[in-house]
Amino acid sequence: MCDRNSQRKIYMLIAIMKKKILFLCTGNSCRSQMAEGWTKFLKKDEIDAYSAGIETHGLNPYAVKVMAEKGVDMSNHESTNVKDLLHIDFDYVITVCGHANENCPIFPGQAKIIHVGFDDPPKMAEKFENEGKKLDCYRKVRDEIKMFIENELDSLL
């Protein structure tokens, strides 16, 4: 049995060992938010996940809805500008869209920049008027991001 001081040291060591990852996209409204949500849901003990955008476009309600369908609550997420997170010493910055990859700022420290592109759900959905078909576009990308977090993320780190 560990005493309180030993437990505190163990928790501090675990916190130090956790990787800090930023998921970056254009507006921090959809893809990067989904990636942050899935990472916190699936790998909270291994990774401190953040998301941001080159700009802030507000949280996409369709993204919130389809993530909630899988038990991931993003209702309290906010759209964050990457400039507000430059003080954090990230281990990895993962760009999830081409615009963010091309305009990724320079991060202090040793952050490794990785690009893993996903389709843009709002752009895919704009050709549909039917709500169900729009949501299907978001579900497709939601599921692709989940597969990436579950099956490929660890191999990149």
PLM regions and their residue ranges:
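N-terminal amphipathic/basic-hydrophobic helices that include classical n-h-c signal peptides
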Residues: M1-I16
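Conserved active-site segments centered on acidic
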Residues: L13-D84
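Short glycine-rich anion-binding loops that position phosphate/pyrophosphate groups of nucleotides
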Residues: G27-S29, G98-N101
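Residues at the C-termini of beta-strands that transition into short coil/loop
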Residues: G53, C97, G117-D119
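Glycine-rich nucleotide phosphate-binding loop and flanking beta-alpha elements
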Residues: M74, A100-N103
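Conserved acidic residues
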Residues: D91
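Phosphate-binding/catalytic loops
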Residues: N103-L157
